[in-house]
Amino acid sequence: MEEAETNTQVDSVPSNSVRSGAELSSKSKLRDSCHACARSKVRCPKQKPSCSRCEARGTTCQYFFSRRPGRRRETSKSPNPEKQIAIGSSHANNRNSPSFSSTRSTLPSPIASDSNSNFTQPQNSSITTVHNGPENSIESPCWEDFSCEFSDTDFVMPTIDTPFDLSPAYSGSVVQEMNDTAPFPLSSSRISMGTTPSGKSSISSYSQILPSITPTTTPVAHISSCRCLATALDLLKTLSLAGLADADSLVSAPIILAENKQSIESVNNLMACPLCSGDSFPLTIFSMIALKILERYAVAARTQHQGTRPQEAEGTVEIKLADIVISNNEDQTRLPSHSNIVCCDDKTQARAAAQLVLGELHHMQRLVNQLSSMIKRSAERDGRKLEILNGYNDSIDSGNSMLASFSASTLELVESDVRKSLRSLSTDIIKELRQH
């Protein structure tokens, strides 16, 4: 029985092939020209079964079937029509679903498999609903038409050059900030840097898709790392507030002199710093502090010229009452004038205050001399820089001048003003002492 069945199957094969050849020959059409005329590229008389031209030459006249362009219908048929019907029905069901219609515009192309990248699912609520369903998963037949196998060269991303460290200890806020800069949205469920042991691999994969981050900071001129400038500004603020307090109330000269001496020592300590010695900003602030100290010296020198307090005047009058001069006439008693007593006492105190201030001005003189030498060294240094840059040092305003700094001429003018103020104060005090 088995041999008979095999024989019948073998016999049926050529019958089918003969039938298909007959059908093909019936559907095909003979050429208009014979093969000999077509090869010679001449016009054929189109006589059948043999044309007159072939008979005259004695060649064999053959008419072949014409070959039409295009594919044949028999070869285009699917070998498995049932599978094609199943795939078509699944496509139709997915297109009719509301989730598919809502995500057609936002659905990106497949990125990569899990073996190549950790970011296969985009961060989108509508897309997430499609992937969660068993019918709409990536493994469903509706994704068979898409090729999900990509090589590493399909998505070439620039390397990351970021100044911060992407360590697994960062919180989710950093991940959200990274999602904003990524070329496509990322899923937080796929990036578990802080809770999963594969955080480092996630970071390395994420670094491959981040765009290149280059610092855009502009070069800045040299800034000293010390806090001398900030300390000098605080001292200048303190002296300014103290000057306002001196103008509102009567402060004794010894207190002002002690505060000025302490301020001078602070400035000397700041000027001894090697980091800010060549910077023009601290030198300018030091000059302003020196002017404020001279202003307080002037206030201390003329403090007693404003008159004494009422209780001090009464005490002075009581002491001077012992010097009452009584004339020989009992009816006439001459008492010293109250204004003359106060004036004499004020002059004595003013002279003492002026002498104290004049004795303390040598500290200020030493400070001004040190400031002047620093300004001169700074001017020489700036001159050498300009000579190197511009080829000459006679002009600061032309060419490539120094960025964010005072010129040497400005510092020299400030130093000259400080020295003139010191000279004027000492001259006024000496003149006042000579007059009294």
From Swiss-Prot:
Compositionally biased intervals (Polar residues): 1-27, 90-136
Tell me which Gene3D superfamilies the record gives: Zn(2)-C6 fungal-type DNA-binding domain
What the protein does comes down to: Transcriptional regulator; part of the gene cluster that mediates the biosynthesis of the dimeric xanthones cryptosporioptides.
Per its UniProt record, what SUPFAM superfamilies does this chain match? Zn2/Cys6 DNA-binding domain (SSF57701)
Spans annotated as Disordered: 1-32, 67-136
Kindly give the Pfam families that the UniProt entry links to this protein: AflR, Zn_clus
The GO terms this record gives for MF are: DNA binding; DNA-binding transcription factor activity, RNA polymerase II-specific; zinc ion binding
**Organism per entry:** Cryptosporiopsis sp. (strain 8999)
Q: Which cysteines are joined by disulfide bonds?
A: none
Instruction: Set out the biological process GO terms recorded for this chain's protein.
Output: aflatoxin biosynthetic process
Q: Which residues bind DNA?
A: 34-61
Q: Say yes or no: keyword Nucleus present.
A: yes
Q: Where in the cell is it found?
A: Nucleus
UniProt KW keywords: DNA-binding, Metal-binding, Nucleus, Transcription, Transcription regulation, Zinc
Q: Which coarse location class describes where this protein primarily resides?
A: nucleus
Protein name, per record = Transcriptional regulator dmxR14
Which GO terms of the cellular component aspect does the record hold?
Answer: nucleus
Q: Any stretches that span the bilayer, and where are they?
A: none
